[in-house]
From Swiss-Prot:
SUPFAM superfamilies: Carbamate kinase-like (SSF53633), PUA domain-like (SSF88697). Its EC number is 2.7.2.11. Pfam families: AA_kinase (PF00696), PUA (PF01472). Pathway: Amino-acid biosynthesis; L-proline biosynthesis; L-glutamate 5-semialdehyde from L-glutamate: step 1/2. PANTHER family: GLUTAMATE 5-KINASE (PTHR43654), ISOPENTENYL PHOSPHATE KINASE (PTHR43654:SF1). NCBIfam families: proB. InterPro entries: AceGlu_kinase-like_sf, Asp/Glu/Uridylate_kinase, G5K_ProB, Glu/AcGlu_kinase, Glu_5kinase, Glu_5kinase/COase_Synthase, Glutamate_5-kinase_CS, PUA. This is Glutamate 5-kinase. ATP binds at K17, S176, D177, T220, G221, G222, M223, V224, S225, K226. It is an enzyme of class 2 (transferase). It comes from Mycolicibacterium gilvum (strain PYR-GCK) (Mycobacterium gilvum (strain PYR-GCK)).
Length: 370
């Protein structure tokens, strides 16, 4: 068994993401029996000494039957209505499942915007930390009643990666109807040329020959979403296991199933992770070629002299994207000036600026190359 599977097996803090298809029958009916099976596997992991945070999809699916809908709704308003009804059923089901073990659950509803704003980000972190300290099981879900993009894309995959870093998890386990990563769709590959199972991914280069298809009709997150989220978490230093919910006992036990994504050797700091992945960019700075080299290759601070244009609406302390002359993003960072102020400084040497404007536009400590 690889060192990364060993790390997942021995992780003391784990985030488990459970997709919609893991909680429904093939016909789309919310299945409490499946949820109880998953709760049993998670309980076994917690009894072994791990803290577990659950990121659970399934609110919309759980709302279909109570609202007497015949299928998953297509329009946004009905999706949000189903989510508002289904979230109650979902959390009650988790509460009943863990109640068998005399455990209390706590509901945490988030959107990507909550994670992106530093104050809300810190509040969410404190809440999750406190729930764990009080030995409650945190059930995290996207707030589908107010979110829009989250309903259309991701099925909590990206959120789970963000939460894993938010709580300082030692491992992220993604459970759905997908048993791991293949270089093609195993359901469509011919018998004489079956899709090859990929046991371990060391980095993006290992995915060069992988063809990712679309997800199930019940969820919104397909393989593309899962790959993106797994690579995000791994890049931040968190090992990831992608496995089938049916294999949850093994995934949460000895981590012998599924595909493991190896983490980068050094864990990214919380601030750099927030700048790189979590924060919403409020604007864009366009850099000349010399500034791109200084920022990307030399890891130096960005000076106003290297900025040729600014766009968006930002203020000092906001996160902005740094783009080259071809409009390709090369970095993200925390800008030191308001847009109106920075616009008067473009292309000017530091020595030509007033003393109060001689700080870098983006300090090297607040820069993350992409």
């Amino acid at each position: 068994m690889s060192v990364h599977r060993d790390a997942i097996r021995g992780a003391r803090s784990v985030v488990v993401k459970i997709g919609t298809t893991a909680l429904t029958t093939p016909s789309g009916v919310f299945d409490r029996g499946r949820l109880h099976y998953l709760a049993d596997a998670i309980e076994a992991r917690m009894k072994a000494g791990s803290d577990v945070v659950i990121v659970s999809s399934g609110a919309i699916a759980a709302g279909i039957e109570p609202l007497k809908l015949t299928k998953r709704p297509a329009d946004l308003a009905t999706k949000q209505a189903a989510a508002s009804v289904g979230q109650v059923a979902l959390v009650n089901s988790w509460s009943a499942a863990f109640g068998r073990y005399d455990r209390t659950v706590g509901q945490v509803l988030l959107t990507a915007h909550d994670i992106s704003m530093r104050v809300q980000h810190n509040n969410a972190q404190r809440t999750l930390d406190r729930l764990r300290a009080l030995h409650a099981v945190a059930i995290v879900n996207e707030n589908d009643t107010v979110a829009t993009n989250e309903i259309r894309f991701g099925d909590n995959d990206r959120l789970s990666a963000l939460v894993a870093h938010l709580v300082g998890a030692d491992a992220l386990i993604l459970l759905s109807d997908i048993d791991g990563l293949y270089d093609g769709d195993p359901r469509k590959a011919p018998e004489d040329n079956p899709a090859r199972f990929i046991s371990e991914v060391s980095g993006p280069d290992d995915l060069a020959d992988v063809t990712a298809g679309r997800g199930s009709h019940l969820g919104t997150g397909g393989m593309v979403s899962k790959l993106s989220s797994a690579l995000l978490a791994a890049d931040a230093g968190v090992p990831v296991l992608l496995a089938a919910a049916a294999d949850a006992a093994s995934a949460l036990g000895d981590a012998s199933v599924g595909t493991v994504f190896a983490p980068r050797p050094e864990r990214m700091s919380a601030r750099r992770f927030w700048v790189r992945y979590a924060a919403e960019a409020s604007g864009t700075l366009t850099l000349d070629d010399g500034a791109v080299r200084a920022v990307v290759q030399q890891r130096r601070s960005l000076l106003p002299a290297g900025i040729s244009a600014v766009s968006g609406r930002f203020f000092g302390g906001d996160v902005v994207e740094l783009r080259d002359q071809e409009n390709a993003m090369v970095a993200r960072g925390v800008v030191a000036y308001d847009k109106a102020e920075l616009a008067t400084m473009l292309g000017r040497s530091t020595s030509d600026l007033p003393a109060e404007m001689r700080r870098p536009a983006v300090h090297a400590d607040d820069l993350v190359a992409v």
